[in-house]
């Protein structure tokens, strides 16, 4: 099954973090970026619907958002009942690096790995 990734955020965060991924890991396939509230009059619901239309209906989707409870995350929560749709929040660079480095893993196993390793990526130096 083909896997697609949605990186969605308030402002340009998703674009910036994906730029970092490209520098470190190279270009990745099937990545869709949603940068909400960048242009006046943008409707987050419409942006998400447009993105979902670009993804094959039988594809697996892993969506990552910047903030739990934020409008971007809340709009994507409407898709939680969709088959093979996974929604993660608290998007950060180590999380996304692991998402792409271990992209061949089963989604459930991969998501468990992401959360386990994300906890060790936050440190006080």
Please tell me what each predicted stretch does:
Residues 2-64, 68-125:
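N-terminal loops that bind phosphate or other acidic moieties
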């Amino acid at each position: 099954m083909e896997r697609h990734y949605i990186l969605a955020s308030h402002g340009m965060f998703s674009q910036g973090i994906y730029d970092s991924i490209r520098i470190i890991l190279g270009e990745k396939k099937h990545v869709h970026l949603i940068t909400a509230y960048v242009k006046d009059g943008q409707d987050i619901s419409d942006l998400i619907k447009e993105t979902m239309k670009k993804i094959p209906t039988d594809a697996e989707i892993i969506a990552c958002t910047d903030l739990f409870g934020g409008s971007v995350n809340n709009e994507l929560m409407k898709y939680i009942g969709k088959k093979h749709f996974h929604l993660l929040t608290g998007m950060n660079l180590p999380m996304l690096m692991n998402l792409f480095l271990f992209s061949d893993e089963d989604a459930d196993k991969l998501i468990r790995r992401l959360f386990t390793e994300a906890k060790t990526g936050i440190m006080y130096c």
